[in-house]
Swiss-Prot record:
<feature type="binding site">
    <location>
        <position position="194"/>
    </location>
    <ligand>
        <name>Zn(2+) 4</name>
    </ligand>
</feature>
<feature type="binding site">
    <location>
        <position position="176"/>
    </location>
    <ligand>
        <name>Zn(2+) 3</name>
    </ligand>
</feature>
<feature type="binding site">
    <location>
        <position position="42"/>
    </location>
    <ligand>
        <name>Zn(2+) 2</name>
    </ligand>
</feature>
<dbReference type="Pfam" id="PF04968">
    <property type="entry name" value="CHORD"/>
</dbReference>
<dbReference type="GO" id="GO:0010824">
    <property type="term" value="P:regulation of centrosome duplication"/>
</dbReference>
<feature type="binding site">
    <location>
        <position position="64"/>
    </location>
    <ligand>
        <name>Zn(2+) 1</name>
    </ligand>
</feature>
<feature type="domain" description="CS">
    <location>
        <begin position="227"/>
        <end position="316"/>
    </location>
</feature>
<dbReference type="InterPro" id="IPR039790">
    <property type="entry name" value="CHRD1"/>
</dbReference>
<dbReference type="GO" id="GO:1900034">
    <property type="term" value="P:regulation of cellular response to heat"/>
</dbReference>
<dbReference type="GO" id="GO:0008270">
    <property type="term" value="F:zinc ion binding"/>
</dbReference>
<dbReference type="InterPro" id="IPR008978">
    <property type="entry name" value="HSP20-like_chaperone"/>
</dbReference>
<feature type="binding site">
    <location>
        <position position="216"/>
    </location>
    <ligand>
        <name>Zn(2+) 3</name>
    </ligand>
</feature>
<dbReference type="InterPro" id="IPR007052">
    <property type="entry name" value="CS_dom"/>
</dbReference>
<feature type="binding site">
    <location>
        <position position="162"/>
    </location>
    <ligand>
        <name>Zn(2+) 3</name>
    </ligand>
</feature>
<feature type="binding site">
    <location>
        <position position="157"/>
    </location>
    <ligand>
        <name>Zn(2+) 3</name>
    </ligand>
</feature>
<feature type="binding site">
    <location>
        <position position="10"/>
    </location>
    <ligand>
        <name>Zn(2+) 1</name>
    </ligand>
</feature>
<keyword id="KW-0677">Repeat</keyword>
């Protein structure tokens, strides 16, 4: 004769004669529901879906239990003594409901025209070591270049957007088609400030032909710093927003990140002659004094402390919200 197991998380039928210490897999704890998350107090797994919660496999082995838990009794309470007795009758496995704290009042959005402050740059040991190696190699390259001013066949043009390479003296007479502006990344769209042909695809952006004509630049001496696009993303926790820029061997002495409560300006020089710029109107408000920048050999992380513990819908404030904010401030 099979019996129904009443252990939480089991619910299977079992044969009492074959019931052993590891026959049942169940939850010895109680259900916990907090901030839309559901789980058991005895294990760490959490889910927002109630069906998933019901299907969470037990975390403890033991005997099947055929004893049905007592139903909660609801007598007509008339005295304090009876209320106390009623509390004792309630099953011990009743779910725990944790009340969330009251929401904080929304902070009034400060003006974007507040003075900008340079965030503290924290340079890692790995970046310092990488820069020391690059310094030695660049010194050796400069000596070689001084010995020979000859341009090697296959040398790419240093102008942004130009894909031509040096094939001989006739290459210097060719017209160079390049982008004279800077790359701009805004609300998922990518374009150059000089021609503003917008696209959401990064490869299409890189393949856009230049909108300006001029002469090719073959050597670093003539090119100087070159503004280039750079992969970057962001993530957040309850109290912090982090922007990651994937630029190798950034130069701390030539780079800076400045911010006020609602604006972020990023200027990174990396790999010797490359530059990355990004200006962001932040979706939320940050605490500038508690924000900083971590610089490593492979990336830069801008850690911004939130002024209020709210989840941001995006990193950047949409244009419509910005205009609405300005209109409200004018009124």
């Amino acid at each position: 004769m099979s019996l129904l197991c009443y252990n939480r998380g089991c619910g299977q039928r079992f044969d009492p004669e074959t019931n052993t210490e590891d026959s049942c897999t169940y939850h010895p704890g109680v259900p916990v529901f907090h901030d839309a998350l559901k789980g058991w107090s005895c294990c760490k797994r959490r889910t927002t879906d109630f069906s998933d919660f019901l299907s969470i496999v037990g975390c403890t082995k033991g005997l099947h239990n055929s004893e049905k838990p007592p139903e909660p009794v609801k007598p007509d309470v008339k005295s304090t003594t009876e209320r106390k007795e009623l509390a004792e009758l309630k099953p011990k496995f009743q779910e725990h409901i944790i009340q969330a704290p009251k929401p904080l009042e929304t902070i009034k959005r400060p003006s974007p025209d507040e003075p900008m402050t340079n965030l503290q740059l924290k340079v890692s040991a790995s970046l310092k070591q990488a820069l020391d190696k690059l310094k030695l190699s660049s010194e050796n390259e400069e000596k070689k270049e001084e010995d020979s001013d000859e341009i090697k066949i296959g040398t790419p043009c240093k102008n942004a957007g130009c894909s031509k390479t040096y094939q001989g003296p006739h290459s210097t007479e060719e017209v160079c088609q390049y982008h004279s502006g800077v790359p701009i990344f805004h609300e998922g769209m990518k374009y150059w400030s000089c021609c503003k042909r917008k696209t959401s695809d990064f490869n299409t952006f890189l393949a856009q032909e230049g909108c300006t004509t001029g002469t090719h630049v073959w050597t670093k001496k003539d090119a100087g710093k070159k503004v280039v696009p750079c992969r970057h993303d962001w993530h957040q926790t309850g109290g912090e927003v982090t922007v990651s820029i994937y630029a190798k061997n950034s130069v701390p002495d030539l780079s800076y990140v400045e911010a006020n409560s609602t604006m972020l300006n990023i200027h990174i020089v990396f790999e010797g002659e490359k530059e990355f710029h990004r200006n962001v109107k932040l979706w939320g408000v940050i605490d500038v004094k508690r924000s900083y920048v971590n610089m490593t050999a492979t990336k830069i992380e801008v850690s911004m402390r939130k002024a209020e513990p709210l989840l941001w819908a995006s990193l950047e404030l949409p244009v419509s919200n910005t205009q609405q904010t300005n209109e409200n401030s004018d009124q």
